[in-house]
């Protein structure tokens, strides 16, 4: 029983220390060496340190390595910036060569793909010519149809007015409409 109580107290103490532990962010200027005991070896101190501090150590090492070489680094970066358009141009040339190789490998498919708009245009022209031939062949029927068009429109406009009373009666009372149709002379 005493062992269980002791374990419970230890767990409580560990959770309290974990809850109140302080974490040093990357931008902190606190030296890491002062946080670790001085009697630990450098290999042991790197193992024992908090994993959150690892990016801070890497950042410090990079800054220490770059600062003495900063003029050289600036010259190299400016040279790289000047070479970027050349790299872009080289990449475009490589893409163009790959496209040319693809075209040569699939010349038949490429030519069919290029001719698709022409095929659609040709089909539309053929349809238009067929329609023109149909109109020329049936010019007499076409002209008669155009001459009777105003008459047909007038007839279509007058037709619903002529049967309107019967249709209203049919809608209201279908039995009376049927009787009325039977009484009409043929």
Curated annotation (Swiss-Prot):
Gene Ontology MF terms in the entry: nutrient reservoir activity
Signal sequence bounds: 1-21
Domain of life, source organism: Eukaryota
DNA repair found in the keyword field: no
UniProt keyword Repeat present: yes
Disulphide linkage map: none
InterPro entries according to UniProt: Zein, Zein-alpha
Note in the entry: The alpha zeins of 19 kDa and 22 kDa account for 70% of the total zein fraction. They are encoded by a large multigene family. Structurally, 22K and 19K zeins are composed of nine adjacent, topologically antiparallel helices clustered within a distorted cylinder.
Family: Belongs to the zein family.
Function field: Zeins are major seed storage proteins.
Protein name (Swiss-Prot/TrEMBL): Zein-alpha PZ19.1
Organism lineage: Eukaryota, Viridiplantae, Streptophyta, Embryophyta, Tracheophyta
């Amino acid at each position: 029983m005493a062992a269980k109580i002791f374990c419970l107290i230890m767990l409580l103490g560990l959770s309290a220390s974990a809850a109140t532990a302080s974490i040093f962010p990357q931008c902190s200027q606190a030296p890491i060496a002062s946080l670790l005991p001085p009697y630990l070896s450098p290999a042991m101190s790197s193992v024992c340190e908090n994993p959150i501090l690892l990016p801070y150590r890497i950042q410090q090492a990079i800054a220490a390595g770059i600062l003495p070489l900063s003029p050289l680094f600036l010259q190299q970066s400016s040279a790289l910036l000047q070479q970027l358009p050349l790299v872009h141009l080289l990449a475009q040339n490589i893409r163009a060569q790959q496209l040319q190789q693809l075209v040569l490998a699939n010349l038949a498919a490429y030519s069919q793909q290029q001719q698709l708009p022409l095929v659609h245009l040709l089909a539309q022209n053929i349809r238009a010519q067929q329609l023109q031939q149909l109109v020329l062949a049936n010019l007499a029927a076409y002209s008669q149809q155009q001459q009777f068009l105003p008459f047909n429109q007038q007839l279509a406009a007058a037709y619903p007015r002529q049967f309107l009373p019967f249709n209203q009666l049919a809608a209201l009372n279908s039995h009376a409409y049927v009787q009325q149709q039977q009484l009409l002379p043929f």
